[in-house]
């Protein structure tokens, strides 16, 4: 059973050890970096993705409730567990969590446009591609393309 859990000192290493395929490494930061960034952000919400007691992925949102902004900052499933439907189940749980706030109208995310990008996954899930190119820290063009999921 797929579930989202707090990252604790007990499961931290199992989350840090998760990895994507080599040709996907330019798509998402290592989980150790994401966890560190999450700890230093006032608006980050992050969880481990587990199949029963086995760590299979990681998710992090940037939730700015006062501005009604939600960004799917990081989402990864370990290379050994991709293609099993875990990502779809976990993302459904994340969306249900975001909906529970009753203030957000959409969830935005982004992807690096390469042959092995997450665009297809997000598109199949119902995300809509926008024409906006993401600027990392509002300083430079990161080349990432924005997508959004409209909450109903």
Residue ranges and their predicted role:
Residues 71, 76, 108-110, 146:
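Conserved beta-strand segments that form the floor/walls of ligand-binding pockets within enzyme
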Residues 78-80, 84, 113-114:
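Active-site acidic-Proline motif in GNAT/NAT acetyltransferases
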Residues 108-119, 136-141:
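Conserved beta-strand-loop-alpha-helix junction that forms the acyl-donor binding cleft
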């Amino acid at each position: 059973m797929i579930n989202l859990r707090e990252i604790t000192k007990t499961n931290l290493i199992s989350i840090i050890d998760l990895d994507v395929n080599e040709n996907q490494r330019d798509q998402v930061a290592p989980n150790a970096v994401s966890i560190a960034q999450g700890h230093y952000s006032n608006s980050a919400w992050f969880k481990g993705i587990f199949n029963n007691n086995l760590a299979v992925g990681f998710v992090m949102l940037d939730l700015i409730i006062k501005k009604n902004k939600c960004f799917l900052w990081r989402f990864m499933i370990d290379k050994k567990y991709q293609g099993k439907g875990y990502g779809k189940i976990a993302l459904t749980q994340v969306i249900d969590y975001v909906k529970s706030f009753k203030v957000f109208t959409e969830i935005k995310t982004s992807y690096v446009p390469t042959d092995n990008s997450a665009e297809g996954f997000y598109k199949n899930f119902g995300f809509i591609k926008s024409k906006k190119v993401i600027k990392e820290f509002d300083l430079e063009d990161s080349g990432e393309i924005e997508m959004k999921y409209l909450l109903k």
